[in-house]
Amino acid sequence: MAPYLQHFIAWFGKDSILSKLIQIFNPPSHSDSAKIIISDDDGRSPEPPGGEEILWRHSAPKSTQMWAFLQKVNKKYGYSLRTYQDLHHWSITHRGQFWGEAWDYCGIRHSRQYDEVVDEAAAMWPRPAWFRGARLNFAENLLFPKVPQAVSDEAIAVISVDEGGKRDFITWQDLRERVRRCQSGMRALKIQPSDRVAGYVANHSNALVAMLATASLGAIWTAVSPDTGVIGAVDRLVQIEPRLLFTDNAVIYNGRIHPVLTKTQEIITALPSLEAVVVMRTVAGVQEDLPSSPRSPAKRLTYNSFLAQGPETQKLEFVHMPAEHPLYILYSSGTTGPPKCIVHGAIGTLMQHKKEHMLQSDIQPGDRLCFVTTCMWMMWHWLVSGLASGATVVLYNGSPFYYAPSSHGTSAKDDLAMPKLVDELGITQFGASATYFSMLERRKHLPRSLTQGRLSLETLKAVYSTGSPLAPSTFRYIYQAFGSQVNLGSISGGTDIIADFGVPSPLQAVVAGEIQVIALGMAVQAWGPTGMDLSVTGEPGELVQFWGPSGASKYESSYFAKYPGVWAHGDHIQINPRTGGLIMLGRSDGTLNPKGVRFGSAEIYHVLQYHFAAQVEDALCVGRRRRQDTDEMVVLFVKMRQDQLWSLALAEAIRRTVREELSPRHVPELIIECPEIPVTANGKKVEVLVKRIVSGVEVPAAGGSGTVNADCLQWFQEWATQN
């Protein structure tokens, strides 16, 4: 629909006779992702007409970086963009202009300027080239951020905190020196561009330094959290063939020390490509030496001996590579087999994160950004990219419910640990999973109240939540608990894009239950099963590179097979046509997502096959989330072998083994014996349908499910009714 017609609708109201005639004869096209709304004099959108509950508006939107960017675009191109919707519409209909302006405004350090941003005529698939001809280094952009207010060498770049009370304040100068020494150690091991360097590490400063040193050489970084079991780690790392592995000696979580090196020893014997293993002394007083083994010739080094390999005179250098050179490998959930290895390039990661930090979130140099995450989750990569915007990055390693006031204090269980850390360190932007905030809400914690925490939280400008949908009641709770001044950014994206589709905006109101806006440069719509755009109706719909020899075909089949030429992300969403906000309804496939942690059923099946094949004939693992549930529950249905009996002892053994081999996050909440596992004609387990049945979403119809043993679906229906 033409912009002037959208203006008419805004002026006269969408329910007026004239507006209805315009909408009938001018239906929106796929490029019309948001209608134009006339702003007030302060740059803010007006009150939505549908009676939505507004919880926050920016007090001075014209002081933000997004407003400055909008004015820069207006001046350069002679536009009169006034609202976020105007800016977003321009960003997706003039993508070359938008990303070129974002490159300039956000500040990308490079040794060669791009020849072309992107071919405007190119479709999403086959994947077009971006910023062709440019050469840069990702680590250089984080260590020497190109921002209007230059950071001081003596300013704090990183604050690393652990559950035991340790505080490590690292200046920009010190961070660069630490990366230099780590890079020198890698050079001694002859690490080259495109080599893979892996971390079996927690969220601490040495992990960040190792990543930056890896990226500085043009090598590729990947990480697996040390709470992941041996099978889970090997399933991922064996595919990428790392040359170098960093590992923690131990981690502290929930008040306990968890040694890591026993698992590390098993992992390295399964990685024939490995040439060296470096042990980081993350927990003092715990084994640090990794004994040699004839099963793996990889060199064993402590972190200090690794650093000592490189000459002290070696300068910090940055290997400049093509803009899309691989930077990170992350992993899919493993729903249909071994987790897929998802490759992310330097410029895509850097541009998306700087856009989201500077424009969408208004993060400024000197702000202090903290997100509770592991190194394996994409939010760690999002967090550490805050350095590129000149922010101080706060790394927290441990349970968010343990707190020690200082390095001399005693760690104790404390539900208000993170709010206390906000006050102690002056954190300005704090983020965690939606489950974390809903847990605080259920426990009725009010950290600023006189009867509880007596905290001020006065430095806090924004709160971010992601991982699963945030309930409207939790929106209200966050404003009650953390203060009316915060921009609540309920954000949504994915490991697949290492970025966000739904983001904050300082030019838009926060509405209870809604993600504020669709991100700039992202043409997001909600499509129905037939490919019809449901965005303007408000109906639910679907939110529309892998490593290895079959990466391109996996990429296409995973994201472009459902709607040819259009990315199908697999999220079930609504778009509010009045506000432009997104409402997340959950996953639209069978991926398990308890407490915001995504993983696949295949990982559970692997453990059962390896450890319980003598007792369990088959199994089905699904997520259950009924209308009244605030989170997804993982349910494991098992079919016993004919001569075997089900018992509670077996269920406990399965839980214990899953916890050890994969992680505590993988442990099913319920393990139930069932008479039969539904399968299709080609033997595929019917997970998605069973998930819908046990969640109360769909009653199985006879003959319509594609299940060869469809009669057994009735058992799942009866179980769901009774439980």
Curated annotation (Swiss-Prot):
The keyword Signal does not apply. Keywords: ATP-binding, Ligase, Nucleotide-binding. It comes from the Eukaryota. Pathway: Secondary metabolite biosynthesis; terpenoid biosynthesis. Pfam families: ACAS_N, AMP-binding, AMP-binding_C. SUPFAM superfamilies: Acetyl-CoA synthetase-like. PROSITE patterns: AMP_BINDING. One of its GO terms (molecular function) is acetoacetate-CoA ligase activity. InterPro entries: Acac_CoA_synth, ACAS_N, AMP-bd_C, AMP-bd_C_sf, AMP-binding_CS, AMP-dep_synth/lig_dom, ANL_N_sf. Its EC number is 6.2.1.-. Malonamoyl-CoA synthetase; part of the gene cluster that mediates the biosynthesis of viridicatumtoxin, a tetracycline-like fungal meroterpenoid with a unique, fused spirobicyclic ring system. The first step of the pathway is the production of the malonamoyl-CoA starter unit for the polyketide synthase vrtA. The aldolase vrtJ may be involved in the synthesis of the malonamate substrate for malonamoyl-CoA synthetase vrtB. The polyketide synthase vrtA then may utilize the malonamoyl-CoA starter unit, followed by sequential condensation of eight malonyl-CoA units to form the polyketide backbone. Belongs to the ATP-dependent AMP-binding enzyme family. This is Malonamoyl-CoA synthetase vrtB. The lineage of its organism: Eukaryota, Fungi, Dikarya, Ascomycota, Pezizomycotina.
